């Protein structure tokens, strides 16, 4: 299947381009109180080193808004303010923030939205129309119920509202907590506008459940060419959100970066400690940004075949094994020497690619 991404309008959040031909960016959201400036900066630095591109923060009141101004001045990443109920907070934050997310289900009247738009237009920052299945405007929930039709009605209504105000720096999200409904919502809206989409399954749960739900929903949409920026929503797992999001992009084949590790699940043929080896390899290669296929296999049944498609590979045997690079055996060593030599070959491969 040939991957073909929808051509969307391009916007900018800080120094990060979204839409058009820009790479799909990965977002997260802080879970500390925004008024805790030091706590927020600590989490922002963690996300920066984890590989996040953009971060969103909640803003409940003016204490949060004033703290956010200080945080923004020291942040290593572009920041989006997440606004519910009080549009005046969005207007205040628009003076210094990189983007605003509004929930059309609770932001209030047209006049409220108009004030937010004027503030964002003045600073040329984008607005995300964040439609959420759990908080749709009454006019649409009364007419359709809490379903895809109501979400679609809300999105189209608010898009037109912003366009009528001559505002087009828009991105849209259509989030639900259900995998199938999330897919259907984004698919329904995609042919009807050319604005970039922010993908996510809302309230996806803890690490295990979020990984499963997000992989199915976001992977499905990405393979259909839908999506310009994304978040894997995960209860209490900051860096893991980024790691899973990057893995979805890589393993779907949509965006090549970092190491793709091929390893067998082990069986009765294994005569080495493959599980220990793969844990070491994962830890020692997680810093690599260059796209690289590596294979760590426990016996000869599939090892040599997988090695032909890998940049660097290990084929374990009984008390010994092979290190293979681009299909050619480069070393036959004792088991306790294999992983170290393998990692040297991996680093050498990375250096060669970085030179190119």
From Swiss-Prot:
- Which residues participate in [4Fe-4S] cluster binding? 264, 267, 299, 306
GO molecular function (one): 4 iron, 4 sulfur cluster binding
> What is the protein's species of origin?
Campylobacter lari (strain RM2100 / D67 / ATCC BAA-1060)
UniProt cross-references to Pfam families, sorted A to Z: GcpE (PF04551)
Q: Which gene encodes it?
A: ispG
Q: Which UniProt keywords apply?
A: 4Fe-4S, Iron, Iron-sulfur, Isoprene biosynthesis, Metal-binding, Oxidoreductase
Q: What is this protein called?
A: 4-hydroxy-3-methylbut-2-en-1-yl diphosphate synthase (flavodoxin)
Report any one BP term from Gene Ontology: isopentenyl diphosphate biosynthetic process, methylerythritol 4-phosphate pathway
Cofactor(s), names only, from the UniProt record: [4Fe-4S] cluster
């Amino acid at each position: 299947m040939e991957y073909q991404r929808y051509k969307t309008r391009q916007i900018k959040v800080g120094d990060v381009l979204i839409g058009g031909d820009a790479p799909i960016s990965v977002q997260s959201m802080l879970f500390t109180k925004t008024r805790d400036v030091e706590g927020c900066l600590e989490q922002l630095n963690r996300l920066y080193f984890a590989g996040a591109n953009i971060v969103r923060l909640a803003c409940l009141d003016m204490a949060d808004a004033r703290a956010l101004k200080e945080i923004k001045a020291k942040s290593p990443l572009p920041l989006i303010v997440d606004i519910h109920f009080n549009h005046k907070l969005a207007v205040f934050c628009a003076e210094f923030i990189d983007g605003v997310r509004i929930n059309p289900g609770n932001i209030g009247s047209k006049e409220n939205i108009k004030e937010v738009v004027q503030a964002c237009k003045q600073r040329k920052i984008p607005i995300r129309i964040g439609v959420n299945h759990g908080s749709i405007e009454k006019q649409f929930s009364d007419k359709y119920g809490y379903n895809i039709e109501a979400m679609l009605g809300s999105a189209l209504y608010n898009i037109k509202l912003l366009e009528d105000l001559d505002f087009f720096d828009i991105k849209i999200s259509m989030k639900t907590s259900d995998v199938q409904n999330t897919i259907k919502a984004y698919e329904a809206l995609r042919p009807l506008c050319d604005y970039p989409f922010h993908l996510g399954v809302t309230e996806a749960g803890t690490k295990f459940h979020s990984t499963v739900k997000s992989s199915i929903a976001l992977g499905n949409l990405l393979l259909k060419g839908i999506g310009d920026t994304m978040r894997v929503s995960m209860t209490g797992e900051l860096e893991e959100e980024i790691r899973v999001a990057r893995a979805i992009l890589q393993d779907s084949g949509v965006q090549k970066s970092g190491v793709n590790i091929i390893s067998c699940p082990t069986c009765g043929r294994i005569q080495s400690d493959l599980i220990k080896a793969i844990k070491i390899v994962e830890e020692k290669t997680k810093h690599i940004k260059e796209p690289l296929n590596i294979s760590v296999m426990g016996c000869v049944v599939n090892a040599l075949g997988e090695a032909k498609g890998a940049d660097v590979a290990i084929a374990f045997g009984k008390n010994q094994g092979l290190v293979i690079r681009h299909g050619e055996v480069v070393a036959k060593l004792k088991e306790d020497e294999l992983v170290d030599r393998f990692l040297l070959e991996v680093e050498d491969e990375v250096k060669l690619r970085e030179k190119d």
